[in-house]
């Protein structure tokens, strides 16, 4: 909570050594805690099983028919200067996206309802071309040039939507 509230735009990112490397925010009116919300969350978490495992292990072990699963992986960069994969020391590369696409198909065959978001790139479109893909105009909060704070993302589902 501290990192989310005190860092630039609530961003989480690491360097190649796996060290957190986001600058502090300039906002002096940061509210670190919301006691009421923390107490409600604490109460809910008492009934929750928390796991510290790779996403693929969790999904292979626990996903079952009719589960609704939302996947929001680090986005595949749309250019050499965009970098949305540095959330872990190992990063998340195209091969990781290919493995995720295979798992998406396995979960589909299992009867899960799936929603995945990602960048609108030819590679990602090809990986999920068997499924329903919607392209959405998006706004970015982080870009040094204000006129470049827009883009296109995709939502992939294995069921029909009205998006």
Task: Label each residue range with its predicted role.
Residues 160-163:
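Flexible, glycine-/basic-rich loop-and-beta segments that form/coincide
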Residues 2-70, 74-84, 99, 110, ...:
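SAM-dependent nucleic-acid methyltransferase catalytic core
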Residues 65-145, 149-155:
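Conserved acidic-Pro-Pro-aromatic motif
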Residues 2, 155-158:
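Short, well-ordered beta-strand micro-motif
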């Amino acid at each position: 909570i501290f990192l989310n509230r005190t860092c630039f735009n609530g961003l989480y990112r690491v360097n190649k050594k796996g060290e957190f490397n986001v600058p502090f925010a300039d906002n002096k009116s940061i509210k670190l805690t919301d006691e009421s919300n923390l107490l409600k969350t604490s109460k809910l978490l008492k009934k929750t099983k928390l796991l510290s495992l790779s996403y693929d292990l969790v999904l292979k072990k626990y996903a079952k028919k009719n589960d609704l699963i939302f996947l929001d992986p680090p986005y595949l960069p749309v250019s050499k200067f965009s970098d949305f994969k540095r959330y872990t020391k190992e990063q998340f590369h195209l091969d990781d996206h290919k493995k995720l696409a295979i798992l998406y198909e396995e979960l589909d065959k299992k009867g899960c309802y799936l929603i995945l978001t990602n960048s609108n790139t030819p590679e990602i479109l090809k990986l999920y071309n068997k499924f329903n893909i919607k392209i959405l105009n998006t706004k970015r909060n982080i870009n040094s040039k204000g006129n470049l704070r827009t883009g296109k993302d995709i939502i992939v589902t294995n069921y029909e939507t009205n998006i």
